[in-house]
């Protein structure tokens, strides 16, 4: 059996998903493809890495196989018996660009196992299994947005997701006359995972200091009670949630000018308040600001490198791509990579 699961890009709502906040992602037309078949032992093969790993029983290797192994462990924890299988994986999702290739791999694995063994679990349960794999087995304290989007994606729609209640709404993504591109900075600073976890701790500290159970109970008034650093972190989360709500409204009204402005202000907040951007992504966003036909841009993903999402009028980005590429190369001696992004449906059999 063969399945595919898409990556995702988040239009807006960055670092809100683990704070019970709102997000506005959509599934993208880049996928992890996965084949599953019965086997005498567990065999995991990656076409992209040209590598095969065999194991008698599931174990943690601190490698790409952990995403698959973690999913199998999560099924077993729920009492499902997963006998040995051969899983072959290939992908046209760029790694590290902020399109969430890991969640796509987890989602493809969860869906394939559920169907192959006849468990036929509902999608939401598979989302929870996939996230558990990343949090408990791989050890990255992610929110639920990435796995949710890979499962529930719908072509020509974004998903307005409340990560606290998991209530969601499909918002039409009518891009006629507009386009979304991803610029990959091709840098990943060492800080990324340690600082990501540190931001999570800081947000937990905000709640502890304020005596609140959830960020949804935090108000602007509460910010005054916080020490400086925590105040900045909390202010970002509160204002980013407001930006998501405004962005949903803008999308519904087809108001891409407003959406673009919200992207720029999201980036400023990630740079100045949450402090997770870096010189390279700041350079890209600053370069794009004020250019003809460019409506908005911001860093996407955990930060400290990765990608920048760009919203523009159709054809406008194409005109300045080379200039951006050259300016970036002159400054950082690094080549940029560009991806035009289109929406896609969620995980499915092929």
From Swiss-Prot:
Main location: cytoplasm
The keyword Transferase appears for this protein: yes
Pathway: Carbohydrate metabolism; galactose metabolism
Entry GO CC: cytosol
Gene Ontology MF terms: ATP binding; galactokinase activity; magnesium ion binding
Annotated residues for binding of Mg(2+): 102, 134
Binding locations of substrate: 14-17, 196
EC code(s) of this entry: 2.7.1.6
Keywords: ATP-binding, Carbohydrate metabolism, Cytoplasm, Galactose metabolism, Kinase, Magnesium, Metal-binding, Nucleotide-binding, Transferase
Catalytic site: 146 (proton acceptor)
Binding site for ATP: 46, 96-102
Site (Transition state stabilizer) location in chain: 8
Record-linked NCBIfam families: gal_kin, PRK03817.1
Function of the protein: Catalyzes the transfer of the gamma-phosphate of ATP to D-galactose to form alpha-D-galactose-1-phosphate (Gal-1-P).
Family indicated by similarity: Belongs to the GHMP kinase family. GalK subfamily.
Full protein name: Galactokinase
Species: Thermotoga neapolitana (strain ATCC 49049 / DSM 4359 / NBRC 107923 / NS-E)
Gene that this polypeptide is encoded by: galK
């Amino acid at each position: 059996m063969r399945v595919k699961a898409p990556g995702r890009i988040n239009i807006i709502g960055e670092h809100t998903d683990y704070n019970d906040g709102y997000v506005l992602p959509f599934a993208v037309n880049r996928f992890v493809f996965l084949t599953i078949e019965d086997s005498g032992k567990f065999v995991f093969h990656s076409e992209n890495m040209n590598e095969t790993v065999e194991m008698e029983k599931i174990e943690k290797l601190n490698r790409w196989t952990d995403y698959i192994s973690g999913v199998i462990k999560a099924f077993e924890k729920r009492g499902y018996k997963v006998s040995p299988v051969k899983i072959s994986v290939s992908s046209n999702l760029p790694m590290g660009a902020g399109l969430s290739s890991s969640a796509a791999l987890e989602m493809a694995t969860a869906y394939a196992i559920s169907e192959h063994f006849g468990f036929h679990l509902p999608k939401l349960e598979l989302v929870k299994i996939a996230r558990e794999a990343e949090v408990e087995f791989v050890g990255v304290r992610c929110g639920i947005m990435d796995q949710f989007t890979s499962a529930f994606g719908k072509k020509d729609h974004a998903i307005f997701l409340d990560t606290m209640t998991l209530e969601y709404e499909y918002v039409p993504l009518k891009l006629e006359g507009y386009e979304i591109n991803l610029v990959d900075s091709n840098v990943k600073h060492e800080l990324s995972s340690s600082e990501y976890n540190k931001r999570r701790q800081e947000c937990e500290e905000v709640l502890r200091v304020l005596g609140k159970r959830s960020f949804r109970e935090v108000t602007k008034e509460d910010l005054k009670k916080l020490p400086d650093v925590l105040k900045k972190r909390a202010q970002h989360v509160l204002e980013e949630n407001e930006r998501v709500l405004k962005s949903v409204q803008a999308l519904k009204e087809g108001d891409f000018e407003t959406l673009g402005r919200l992207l720029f202000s999201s980036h400023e907040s990630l740079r100045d308040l949450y402090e997770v951007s870096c010189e390279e992504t700041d350079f890209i966003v600053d370069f794009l600001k004020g250019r003809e036909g460019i409506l908005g841009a911001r860093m996407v993903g955990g930060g400290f490198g990765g990608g920048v999402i760009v919203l523009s009028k159709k054809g406008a980005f194409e005109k300045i791509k080379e200039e951006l590429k050259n300016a970036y190369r002159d400054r950082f001696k690094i080549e940029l990579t560009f991806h035009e992004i289109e929406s896609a449906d969620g995980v499915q059999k092929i």
